[in-house]
């Protein structure tokens, strides 16, 4: 395709047009600031130092280490000793000034203190132990005025900002996340930057904002900031790890940091010259040496002179200004929460479905209750379920609080709203939403046949609603004052467990132990249950059921000599007052009905205030940032205090002189040359809505070649990489993938390496363990274990990871830094020795320029050694791009604009584009040039490519390669997995156990949960006697042991999901091990910890309650409880496996356990259950557990009734009680006994004679 010369001339002025557009849009945005806020003016900082927690390295906090720390805390000597917390200096004596309208670039390798400097200048100091020095602002007050037309200005500004950031097309699209599909990663990054930009701040601090953006988009964003900073007279501070010459030219000043030391601060134009001036003998080697040279320079003296604060200055206050008043912040937050509810349809549809299913299940289970005494227990059981649903629903609040916390902290820093306004807005949004949730439960009320009057219905509704609101803010308050979800599970679980126990149903208030009965007064569930029980039963009248009439039979026709064997009955009267029953059985008083609603309202107000205060106190945790945790410390003869000052040798771009192609002693482990040709032809990927992500993309990878995949954000780079690696699972894919001209073998997954952009690792594994697992499971079984381990050590040396080989990978900020994690990611794939090719997705993203070049040079060495590499890359420098052999360049829509060799100094591809557009300048980065010219939407680069001679040449070469067919599996095994199944299971189970062992919070949390819940059960039913109430207590104590299940599930599910996500994201795609290996290993590793927790709980519970101590009965009870504990673990993992996130799984846990517990026996005894549901008992594990352990506990237990439990009836004249009731006791279904058979007037009857009779009422078998 011939492009006219005029077109190429027009392309040369496109930059000027784009610059004019930016200036116009920025001008409009600045002009709309009718109510300009107060400006800080010049920012001055003098001798600014920051001290952080920790010393940079620690032992990993595994179970033995945690126990050791607990023992030390238990020592009285530890109580009085006041050893200072370990600390280290993160930033040292930073001095300088940022004038109005200036931009300061902060440069340094990761860990040098760039982020710390930005936070210190922005006055965000709560994360650090201490800060020293001062930050001032010159007083330059610009008083704000009210905007009379705020709504129209907001809409205008929105459109302006969307155009500035290139987000017009994404304006109405859901942002999404790792689990919810939305906009692209680059667009998501721009949304975050736009959010901060819209604050109209006087001081902007951006920490590596161009990470994840292509160079063209990055330069545009920096241009926008340059224009806005100049026009609005604000100040901008920004750290950049990979800054091009074009980017540097936009800044006024540069700050260079090295391990917290200032190496340079001054004008950007002098930054290159100053290091050269410092290279005088002796040459500075350590960061402190460079700092000393800087202090001797004229630039330091200029910074000190500028930092001498004039008279009209004041200390920089903590940020306090908000654009909106507090009440308006509450309103905006409330509206936002409504929008979240309405747009997150999946969550509320699932919640509504689950609640309605629960309501229908319970409604059919307890349906059509009649006004007879036999239905009183089931009616109260149904009321208890209404309360239980509220408790389980409210307990899920704690998980959602942690999900929202990062967003809240970010927007708090941006001064969008006070955290207290967010809290109150969330509570106000809950007011109608919780009511809707209760309305889902309406089938319960109408199907069960609760009292059908408006007064009773709305009283039931109000009681449940107010109780739900109180419980919700109560559990939310726990989350607000807890640092992590793992630690919040303990108080949430214990509180839920205690609240359920003391609802008043399991153990009635008259039967509560004196020392624990006070708990019910702090239990909102108790107040709900008492009110709805009084509302439903208190003013009713119930006819005595035939089974409750004593004595009964053909002989007994006169009710004068009969009674109803139910609490609250009157001798000679077979009609029972609901008020007397509820008072005698539960101790509930009718006058408390509305009082309880008021108490729950007070609970709601109190904890709402507490949540508001707690959110106002939200801080980023003062963690030991940038700390590396070791399995064992690599230093043995150096004290901790000394280690903080030891300078580590600098990491150079040279790989330690290790030559992967040399014939040294590691020759046996070096990379074998790859002889496979990987090709793809006419690949297209189309979504269901017709959108094309890839469009007829063709190409190939020659053995030992290194190919770059580039394009603008949203061009489809990662999509193409995932497609080539067979990791795409959306849309319709057409075209072909070939290895040596043949279809891909099933072993393709494990014979290729894939380095993810996000560095997916199990945080508890050490570097060496991660590489060893990859080598053991992905290399063929024919290779000995010794050879695999030797190869791992070679890779560790190759990647210069000897000093961190035994370090736990951790998470960013509490583990390895970004560059080291990237090396680990590459090492994991190299340990598997992929013999086909190696995919890398953005391996240099987030790294500084030196580290990025080091990674690319490493890839070059691997390629030279025979490894085929395909790599996506966003912002390569000219040095980096020249390391590649070929380039595949995409534009939005997944269309190809070029595929072929780069040529020496990229001359081949530059000459190609220069035929159709402006030439590349001598000083211009070729990568920036290619992205800039290909982003011109006025030129149809795809059509130019299709009609170019280069395209025809590549097509001919592709067809030649496809016709040179060779069996791709001939050079290696075509098995999907490299090693046998049992070896997979052993290796993965060992890793899972180590993962648990190094998470002391999880293991000790499980122990603590079982200790506290066992103690609560044991103390609540302490040393029960043989009377009727305590016999009931024996049965319900067993049921209380069952309600530990939801609590333990909340703790098990996050651990399972962490392992599952690791498997699905990387190991499953790479065919490391079979999916069933994961599920079995996850269950196997849970067993010992589950059995330990079960043992602790059972010992505390069984003997405190006073069950049988004999070995046969105690042994049976122990076996049954351990089996129940295993069932809990397996059910929790099943629930977690069915849901994508921890929050979704924990929300579903309440529903799952409600269904499971419904058919356990005591809550809905089989004799009273409708026939349509009785089959469910045959498949209910909890029914067998309670039946077995209940029968074991109650068999041959003689029951004696105390005074209040005795039922009275009169005997006829001239007859003793025994003779009169003889016919009744001869009946097969008769239970109980007469206490005074020889009496002739009032007969005293006990409803049950022994435990077997009592159990038969719940379990007829």
Curated annotation (Swiss-Prot):
One of its GO terms (cellular component) is plasma membrane. Its main location: membrane. InterPro entries: AAA+_ATPase, ABC2_TM, ABC_transporter-like_ATP-bd, ABCG_dom, ABCG_PDR_2, P-loop_NTPase, PDR_CDR_ABC. ATP binds at residues 711-718. The keyword ATP-binding applies. Belongs to the ABC transporter superfamily. ABCG family. PDR (TC 3.A.1.205) subfamily. This is ABC-type transporter tndA.
């Amino acid at each position: 395709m011939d492009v006219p010369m005029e077109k190429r001339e027009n392309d040369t002025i496109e930059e000027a047009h784009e610059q004019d557009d930016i200036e116009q849009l920025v001008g409009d945005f600045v002009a709309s600031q009718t109510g300009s806020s107060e400006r800080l003016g010049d920012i001055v900082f003098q001798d600014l130092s920051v001290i952080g927690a920790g010393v940079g390295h620690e032992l990993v906090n595994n179970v033995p280490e945690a126990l050791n720390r607990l023992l030390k805390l238990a020592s009285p000597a530890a109580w009085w000793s006041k050893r200072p917390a370990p600390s280290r200096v993160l930033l040292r004596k930073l001095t300088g000034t940022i004038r109005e309208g200036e931009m300061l670039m902060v440069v340094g390798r990761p860990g040098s203190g760039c982020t710390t400097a930005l936070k210190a200048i922005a006055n965000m100091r709560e994360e650090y132990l201490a800060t020293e020095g001062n930050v001032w602002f010159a007083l330059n007050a610009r008083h704000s005025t009210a905007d009379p037309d705020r709504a129209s200005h907001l809409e205008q500004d929105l459109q302006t900002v969307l155009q500035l950031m290139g987000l017009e097309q994404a304006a109405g699209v859901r942002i999404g996340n790792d689990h919810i599909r939305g906009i692209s990663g680059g667009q998501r990054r721009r949304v975050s930057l736009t959010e901060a930009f819209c604050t109209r701040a006087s001081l902007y601090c951006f920490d590596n904002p161009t990470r994840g953006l292509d160079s063209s988009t990055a330069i545009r964003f920096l241009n926008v900031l340059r224009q806005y900073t100049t026009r609005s007279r604000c100040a901008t501070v920004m750290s950049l790890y990979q800054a091009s010459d074009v980017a540097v030219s936009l800044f006024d000043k540069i700050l260079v940091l090295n391990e917290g030391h200032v190496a340079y601060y001054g004008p950007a134009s002098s930054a290159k010259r100053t290091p050269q001036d410092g290279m005088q003998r002796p040459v500075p080697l350590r960061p402190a040496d460079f700092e000393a040279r800087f202090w001797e320079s004229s630039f330091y003296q200029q910074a000190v002179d500028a930092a001498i604060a004039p008279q009209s200055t004041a200390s920089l206050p903590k940020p306090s200004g908000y654009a909106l008043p507090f009440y308006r912040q509450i309103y905006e937050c409330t509206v936002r929460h409504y929008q979240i509810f309405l747009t997150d349809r999946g969550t509320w549809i699932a919640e509504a479905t689950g609640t309605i299913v629960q309501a229908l299940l319970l409604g059919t289970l307890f349906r059509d209750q009649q006004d007879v005494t036999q239905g009183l227990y089931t009616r109260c059981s149904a009321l208890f379920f209404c309360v239980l649903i509220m408790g389980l629903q409210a307990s899920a609040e704690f998980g959602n609080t942690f999900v929202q916390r990062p967003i809240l902290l970010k927007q708090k820093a941006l001064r969008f709203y006070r955290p207290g306004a967010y809290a109150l807005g969330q509570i106000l949004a809950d007011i109608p939403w919780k009511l809707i949730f209760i309305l889902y439960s309406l089938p319960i009320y109408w199907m069960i046949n609760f009292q059908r009057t408006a007064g009773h219905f709305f009283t039931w509704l109000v009681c449940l609603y107010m109780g739900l609101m109180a419980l919700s803010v109560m559990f939310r308050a726990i989350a607000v004052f807890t640092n992590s979800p793992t630690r919040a599970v303990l108080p949430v679980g214990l509180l839920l467990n205690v609240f359920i126990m003391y609802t008043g149903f399991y153990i009635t208030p008259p039967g509560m132990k004196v020392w624990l009965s006070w708990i019910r007064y702090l239990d909102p569930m108790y107040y709900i249950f008492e009110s709805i029980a009084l509302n439903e039963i208190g003013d009713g009248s119930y006819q005595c059921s035939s089974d409750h009439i004593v004595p009964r039979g053909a002989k007994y026709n006169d009710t004068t000599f009969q009674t109803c064997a139910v609490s609250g009955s009157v001798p000679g009267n077979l009609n029972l007052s609901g008020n007397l029953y509820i008072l005698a059985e539960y101790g509930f008083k009718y006058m408390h009905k509305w009082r309880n609603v008021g108490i729950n309202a007070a609970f709601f107000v109190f904890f709402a205030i507490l949540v508001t205060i707690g959110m106002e106190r939200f801080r980023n945790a003062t963690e030991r940032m940038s700390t590396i945790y070791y399995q064992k410390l690599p230093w043995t003869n150096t004290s901790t205090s000394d280690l903080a000052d030891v300078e580590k040798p600098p990491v150079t771009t040279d790989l330690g002189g290790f030559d992967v192609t040399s014939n040294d002693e590691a020759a046996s482990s070096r990379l074998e040359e790859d002889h496979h040709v990987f090709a793809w032809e006419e690949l297209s990927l189309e979504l269901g809505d017709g959108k094309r992500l890839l469009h007829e993309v063709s190409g190939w990878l020659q053995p030992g070649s290194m190919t770059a995949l580039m394009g603008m954000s949203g061009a489809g780079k990662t999509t193409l990489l995932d497609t080539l690696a067979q990791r795409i699972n959306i849309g319709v894919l057409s075209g072909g993938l070939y290895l040596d001209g043949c279809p891909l073998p099933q072993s393709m997954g494990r014979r290729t390496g894939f380095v993810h952009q996000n560095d997916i690792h199990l945080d508890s594994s050490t570097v060496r363990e991660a590489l060893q697992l990859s080598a053991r499971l992905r290399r063929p079984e024919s290779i000995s274990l010794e050879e695999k381990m030797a190869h791992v050590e070679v890779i560790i040396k190759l990647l210069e990871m000897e000093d961190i080989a035994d370090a736990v990978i951790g998470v960013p900020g509490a583990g390895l830094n970004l560059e080291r994690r990237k090396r680990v990611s590459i090492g994991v794939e190299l340990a598997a020795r992929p013999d086909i090719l190696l995919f890398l997705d953005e391996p240099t993203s987030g790294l500084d320029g030196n580290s990025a070049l080091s990674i690319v040079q490493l890839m070059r060495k691997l390629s030279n050694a025979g490894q085929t590499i395909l790599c996506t890359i966003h912002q390569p420098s000219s040095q980096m791009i020249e390391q590649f052999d070929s380039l595949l360049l995409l534009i939005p829509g997944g269309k190809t604009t070029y595929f072929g060799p780069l040529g020496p100094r990229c001359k081949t591809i530059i000459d190609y584009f220069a035929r159709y557009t402006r030439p590349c300048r001598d000083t211009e980065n070729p990568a920036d040039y290619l992205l800039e010219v290909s982003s011109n939407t006025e030129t149809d680069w795809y059509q130019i490519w299709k009609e170019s001679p280069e395209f025809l040449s590549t097509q001919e070469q592709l067809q030649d390669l496809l016709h040179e067919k060779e069996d791709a599996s001939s050079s290696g095994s075509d098995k999907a997995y490299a090693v046998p199944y049992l070896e997979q299971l052993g290796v993965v189970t060992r890793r899972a156990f180590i993962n648990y062992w190094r998470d002391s919070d999880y293991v000790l949390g499980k122990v603590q949960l079982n200790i506290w819940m066992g103690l609560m059960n044991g103390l609540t039913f302490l040393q029960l006697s043989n009377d009727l109430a305590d016999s009931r207590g024996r049965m319900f104590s067993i049921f209380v042991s069952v309600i530990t299940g939801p609590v333990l599930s909340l703790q098990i599910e996050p651990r399972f999901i962490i392992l599952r996500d690791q498997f699905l994201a990387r190991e499953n795609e790479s065919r490391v091990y079979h999916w069933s290996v994961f599920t079995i290993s996850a269950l196997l590793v849970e067993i010992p910890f589950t059995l330990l927790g079960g043992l602790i709980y059972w010992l505390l519970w069984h003997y405190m309650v006073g069950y049988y101590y004999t070995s046969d009965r105690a042994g049976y009870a122990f076996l049954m409880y351990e089996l129940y504990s295993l069932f809990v673990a397996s059910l929790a993992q099943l629930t977690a496996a069915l849901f994508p996130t921890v929050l979704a799984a924990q929300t579903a846990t309440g529903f799952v356990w409600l269904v499971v517990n419904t058919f356990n026996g005591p809550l809905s005894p089989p004799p009273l259950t409708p026939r349509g549901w009785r089959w469910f008992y045959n498949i209910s594990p909890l029914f067998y557990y309670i039946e077995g352990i209940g029968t074991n506990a109650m068999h041959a237990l003689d029951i004696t009734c105390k005074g209040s439990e005795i039922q009275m009836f009169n005997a006829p004249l001239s007859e003793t009680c025994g003779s009169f009731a003889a016919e009744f006791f001869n009946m097969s279904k008769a239970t109980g006994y007469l206490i005074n058979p020889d009496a002739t007037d009032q007969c005293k009857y006990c409803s049950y004679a022994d435990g077997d009779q009592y159990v038969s009422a719940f379990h007829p078998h």
